[in-house]
């Protein structure tokens, strides 16, 4: 059998025309320099506003410290009153518990000094309920 001839596609005579491969986008938006300038301006504005807020925050912090310093003697006096009240209640409880022990001196200091020694937590809350000890040690807790 005779092989059939295949006709091959060829370019047109004279070749194909020029192909437009460039993107023709309209020029729009800011130039690179102007975008850089806007970015620097935004950065400077951010630094300026942050500097202003830091100054205001420092002023508020100083005001809080001054208020805390002004209230410190009152808070210390309240704490001292509470401690002395608890020590008095502890002495009364010690007197009732140790009344039958011969030679026991109620309120005798365990320290051999005449100076004031701030009582420890165990000394203050030794005769208290465990809920009160937990509340004094850890503050308010839900699970007790």
From Swiss-Prot:
The modification N-acetylalanine is found at residue 2. GO terms for molecular function: NADH dehydrogenase (ubiquinone) activity. It is a single-pass membrane protein. One of its GO terms (cellular component) is mitochondrial inner membrane. Keywords: Acetylation, Apoptosis, Electron transport, Membrane, Mitochondrion, Mitochondrion inner membrane, Nucleus, Respiratory chain, Transmembrane, Transmembrane helix, Transport. The chain crosses the membrane at residues 30-51. Pfam families: GRIM-19. GO terms for biological process: apoptotic process; negative regulation of DNA-templated transcription. It is found in: Mitochondrion inner membrane; Nucleus. Accessory subunit of the mitochondrial membrane respiratory chain NADH dehydrogenase (Complex I), that is believed not to be involved in catalysis. Complex I functions in the transfer of electrons from NADH to the respiratory chain. The immediate electron acceptor for the enzyme is believed to be ubiquinone. Involved in the interferon/all-trans-retinoic acid (IFN/RA) induced cell death. This apoptotic activity is inhibited by interaction with viral IRF1. Prevents the transactivation of STAT3 target genes. Complex I is composed of 45 different subunits. Interacts with CARD15, but not with CARD4. Interacts with STAT3, but not with STAT1, STAT2 and STAT5A. Interacts with OLFM4. Belongs to the complex I NDUFA13 subunit family. This is NADH dehydrogenase [ubiquinone] 1 alpha subcomplex subunit 13. It comes from Bos taurus (Bovine). The gene is NDUFA13.
